[in-house]
Amino acid sequence: MSVDKRTLIAVIGDEDTTTGLLLAGIGQITKETNEKNFFIYEDGKTTKEQILNNFINYTQERQDIAILLINQHIAEKIRSDIDNYTNAFPAILEIPSKDHPYDPEKDSVLKRVRRLFGE
């Protein structure tokens, strides 16, 4: 599928973050396959495998996702996979959550940009 077909924003986030983004209008359930473009992480219940499976689904299997938003504290649980992701689409953006502030030192995209500019 071409880049112009990538029209959705996906989210892997905690309940508060995901709910806020759904209320803002990013929620989508695909009619044909009944797939959601969001995954709610539950602390103490969600496994690393579940996070990784959704990450792979949104970045490799689904061809309609343009941007993947992921809470940074959840991204830490699959850091090596995020660091090794090099495709332009979907773009991965790490975002803060209500209980976990954003740390630019952990952000893979920011690290790549710094390396590119020799910082």
UniProtKB/Swiss-Prot annotation:
GO terms for molecular function: proton-transporting ATPase activity, rotational mechanism. It is a peripheral membrane protein. Keywords: Hydrogen ion transport, Ion transport, Membrane, Transport, Vacuole. Its main location: membrane. It is found in: Vacuole membrane. This is V-type proton ATPase subunit F. Belongs to the V-ATPase F subunit family. GO terms for cellular component: fungal-type vacuole membrane; vacuolar proton-transporting V-type ATPase, V1 domain. V-ATPase is a heteromultimeric enzyme composed of a peripheral catalytic V1 complex (components A to H) attached to an integral membrane V0 proton pore complex (components: a, c, c', c'', d, e, f and VOA1). NCBIfam families: V_ATP_synt_F. It comes from Vanderwaltozyma polyspora (strain ATCC 22028 / DSM 70294 / BCRC 21397 / CBS 2163 / NBRC 10782 / NRRL Y-8283 / UCD 57-17) (Kluyveromyces polysporus). The keyword Transport applies. Subunit of the V1 complex of vacuolar(H+)-ATPase (V-ATPase), a multisubunit enzyme composed of a peripheral complex (V1) that hydrolyzes ATP and a membrane integral complex (V0) that translocates protons. V-ATPase is responsible for acidifying and maintaining the pH of intracellular compartments.
